[in-house]
């Protein structure tokens, strides 16, 4: 019976890893309100319909990383990272000692948060490298590969959670069949240690909820003072951890005090669907980026806004290609321009974009004569007579 409970515990804790991601993506488009996280939750995207809103979050993260090492944003970011490591260690030791899958799963969740943050920081460091002779377009796709890998693992974990939860739920609902059902390396007998010391497990989870809620409030306060979007996203990560920790706490309490072991695998099944949706949508987005899909509207707005605020020059933006780390901007110039004038204009546009968007390590600007066949081809592809006219274009959010 406890084994069933343990299985769902694992599933319940898988939810936290996904919820923070959802809350972060969503805050970008919804003013960081938790209700958006719930909505995104149901859609199951960056669930990017989270689109990982991610490009905007990535731009904000790079801004924060470029600040001084003692900035409030980085201090709290590292505090959150250390708290995840501490919680993972405490829950892992407690879970093994009490033979509690819910604590072990909780520890895995905290460790998953930590690994995800480290992967993000590592890929950002790689992506920030300047283009080389071997990689003239920069290293921007490393971030996409990292996202694709982590999302793939998330999908695999969700499938494992679903299988384990359904198996234990079946055993509880049909005990006559479950009595003959065994797994290699374990049985479905309840853990006596956990039932003898339930408050130790409950205390560890409750403590993590309190810590995460405290981190949420402190981080949100600093984020509002510093007007830091990325820090506000991080705050909602902590709130999501606290809320989903409450779900695990309720599942564990119900299993023990109400003698309802089915709660754990039941919640595990629901969570596995949400986790799978998150992983699938993030993987899909990363896969499409590897296929050089058009950049998100967020990136296009960032580039056009940067150019609108820059020096007024005689050109039009034909199209924008690339990702949050490496962009390719094609512009049209007057037919009367010489090759030297076009080259100088392209250099000015490139500098304007790179200065305005710190996340970019590479920006290639290709000038084309406005009466050339290539410009007409791009205009036809974009379905317009010209994407943007820089001198007169008015952009609104």
Swiss-Prot record:
> Which positions form S-S bridges?
none
The record, for Gene3D superfamilies, names: Cation efflux protein transmembrane domain
Q: Name one Pfam family in it.
A: Cation_efflux
Tell me where the transmembrane regions lie. Answer: 142-162, 191-211, 242-258, 260-280
Q: How does it sit in the membrane?
A: Multi-pass membrane protein
Any one GO BP annotation for this protein: iron import into the mitochondrion
Q: Where in the cell is it found?
A: Membrane
Cross-referenced NCBIfam families, in alphabetical order? CDF
> Which family is this sequence assigned to?
Belongs to the cation diffusion facilitator (CDF) transporter (TC 2.A.4) family. SLC30A subfamily.
Name-wise, this protein is Uncharacterized metal transporter C1020.03
List the source organism: Schizosaccharomyces pombe (strain 972 / ATCC 24843)
């Amino acid at each position: 019976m406890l084994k069933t409970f343990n299985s769902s515990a694992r599933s319940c804790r898988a939810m936290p890893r996904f919820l923070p991601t959802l809350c972060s993506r969503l805050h970008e488009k919804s003013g960081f309100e938790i209700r958006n996280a719930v909505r995104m939750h149901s859609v199951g995207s960056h669930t990017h319909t989270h689109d990982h809103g991610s490009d905007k979050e990535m731009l904000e993260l790079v801004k924060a990383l470029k600040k001084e090492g003692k900035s409030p944003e980085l201090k709290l970011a590292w505090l959150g990272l250390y708290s995840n490591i501490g919680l993972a260690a405490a829950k892992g030791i407690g879970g093994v000692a009490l033979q509690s899958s819910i604590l072990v799963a909780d520890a895995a969740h905290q460790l998953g948060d930590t690994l995800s943050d480290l992967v993000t920081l590592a890929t950002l460091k790689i992506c920030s490298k300047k283009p080389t002779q071997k990689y003239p377009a920069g290293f921007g796709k490393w971030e996409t590969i990292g996202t694709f890998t982590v999302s793939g693992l998330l999908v695999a974990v969700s499938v494992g959670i679903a299988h384990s939860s359904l198996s234990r739920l079946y055993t509880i609902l049909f005990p006559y069949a479950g009595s003959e059902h065994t797994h290699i390396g374990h049985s479905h007998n309840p853990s006596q240690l956990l039932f003898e010391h339930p408050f130790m497990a409950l205390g560890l989870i409750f403590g993590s909820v309190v810590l995460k809620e405290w981190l949420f409030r402190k981080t949100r306060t600093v984020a509002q003072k510093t007007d830091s979007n990325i820090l506000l996203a991080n705050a909602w990560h902590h709130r999501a951890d606290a809320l989903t920790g409450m779900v695990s706490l309720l599942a564990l309490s119900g299993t023990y005090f109400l003698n309802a072991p089915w709660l754990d695998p039941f919640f595990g099944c629901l969570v596995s669907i949400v986790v799978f949706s998150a992983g699938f949508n993030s993987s899909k987005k990363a896969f499409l980026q590897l296929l050089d899909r058009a950049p998100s509207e967020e990136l296009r707005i960032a580039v056009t806004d940067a150019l609108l605020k820059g020096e007024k020059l005689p050109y039009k933006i034909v199209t924008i290609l690339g990702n949050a780390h490496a962009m390719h901007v094609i512009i049209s110039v007057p037919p009367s321009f010489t090759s030297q004038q076009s080259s100088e204009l392209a250099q000015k546009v490139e500098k304007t974009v790179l200065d305005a968007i710190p996340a970019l390590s590479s920006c290639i600007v290709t000038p084309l004569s406005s009466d050339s066949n290539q410009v007409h081809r791009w205009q036809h592809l974009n379905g317009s007579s010209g994407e943007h006219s820089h001198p007169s274009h008015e952009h609104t959010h």
